């Protein structure tokens, strides 16, 4: 066997098939060719990765528009415009949904301890008995007829009740009928009223609604628990931010267990408010706990739904919580123009805008926006 080295320790010399030595210069040509190929492949891979990253971030950060089609859980929405809840508007829903609103949130439907008197001549919307299912079912059928979706707002009147029984977290006078005293809620009252909300959600599902909203704003009963002014409790439902949120969180959990995963569960909560001692930390904590409890959608309002100041008046608080939560958030309050809606969507994580009074004034405003955009 022929040795291809001169002596031990000397440089290894390769030979060709005929036994002739291969010059060192020729030996180095192949590695150079391999290195060049590897460089080209690396450049191509870098270009592919760069293009992929570019399109990923372009899609991820694409500016939202009013007329985007979106998916809310299992709902395919035709745009980002909702009709927000406002009292005594059930008969106007058809006029609104046939003009291209994507989703309707009804006026508050009382879940229990219903009261009525001459102080409320029209009376509130009701869902505290199965006998009201046929009535509310008509609204769901109207919404679906026009390719819109509908959510039933569930409310307990609390201190805005005008006759007994009047319940509150810690007692006090009524807010509408100031001559009556409210009853501080016992644990049994809390559990009973939580079940009222659950039964209301079950009835909404039977009536064909796409979801329900827990009304936890505007000084209704659930709203009062978030307020240090009205909630002086020292048990599990008062004191800390987490405890003040417990009532609405338990309602959401129980509703989810009762109606399953397909139904949308939304909540309307109060923005921070100095006069009613609703803190920013409480506002944020409530949002986080509701998200953990299985909430699908959130709307931000306030103890006083009609605020003074620049429109849209809940935008800053809504923007803040939308940056923290992963669930979609609705901005409502004082939105009247396309430019406002467009700005809100393009400059925040807010997913949807809702109008109430403006849609009542101009039921075809969404169509006008589309034609003039």
Task: Spell out what each predicted region is.
Residues 6-9, 34-36, 51, 267:
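Compositionally biased regions
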């Amino acid at each position: 066997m022929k040795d291809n080295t001169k002596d031990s320790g000397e440089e290894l010399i390769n030979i060709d098939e005929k036994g002739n030595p291969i010059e060192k210069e020729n030996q180095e040509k192949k590695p150079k060719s391999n290195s060049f190929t590897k460089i080209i492949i690396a450049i191509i891979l870098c270009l592919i990765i760069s293009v992929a990253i570019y399109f990923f971030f372009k899609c991820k950060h694409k500016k939202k528009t009013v007329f985007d089609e979106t998916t809310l859980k299992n709902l395919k929405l035709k745009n980002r415009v909702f009709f927000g809840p406002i009292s005594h508007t059930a008969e106007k829903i058809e006029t609104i949904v046939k003009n291209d609103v994507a989703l309707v949130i009804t006026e508050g439907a009382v879940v229990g301890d219903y009261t009525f008197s001459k102080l409320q001549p029209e009376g509130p919307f009701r869902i505290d008995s199965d006998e009201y299912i046929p009535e509310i079912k008509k609204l769901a059928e109207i919404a679906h007829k026009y390719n819109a979706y509908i959510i039933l707002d569930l409310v307990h009147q609390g201190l805005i009740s005008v006759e007994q029984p009047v319940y509150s977290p810690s007692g006090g006078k009524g807010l509408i009928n100031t001559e009556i005293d409210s009853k501080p809620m016992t644990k049994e009252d809390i559990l009973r009223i939580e079940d009222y909300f659950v039964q209301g959600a079950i009835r909404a599902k039977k009536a064909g609604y796409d979801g329900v909203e827990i009304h936890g704003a505007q000084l209704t009963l659930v709203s009062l628990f978030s307020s240090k002014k009205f909630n002086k409790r020292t048990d599990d439902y008062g004191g800390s931010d987490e405890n003040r949120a417990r009532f609405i969180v338990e309602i959401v959990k129980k509703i989810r267990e009762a109606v399953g995963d397909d139904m949308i569960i939304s909540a309307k909560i109060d923005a921070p408010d100095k006069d009613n001692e609703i803190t920013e930390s409480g506002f944020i904590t409530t949002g986080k706990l509701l998200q953990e409890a299985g909430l699908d959608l959130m709307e931000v309002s306030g103890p006083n739904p009609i605020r003074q100041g620049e429109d849209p008046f809940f935008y800053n608080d809504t923007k803040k919580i939308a940056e923290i939560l992963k669930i979609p958030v609705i901005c409502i309050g004082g939105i009247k123009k396309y430019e406002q809606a467009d700005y809100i969507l393009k400059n925040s994580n807010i997913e949807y805008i809702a109008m109430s009074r403006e849609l009542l004034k101009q039921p075809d405003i969404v169509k006008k926006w589309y034609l003039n955009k």
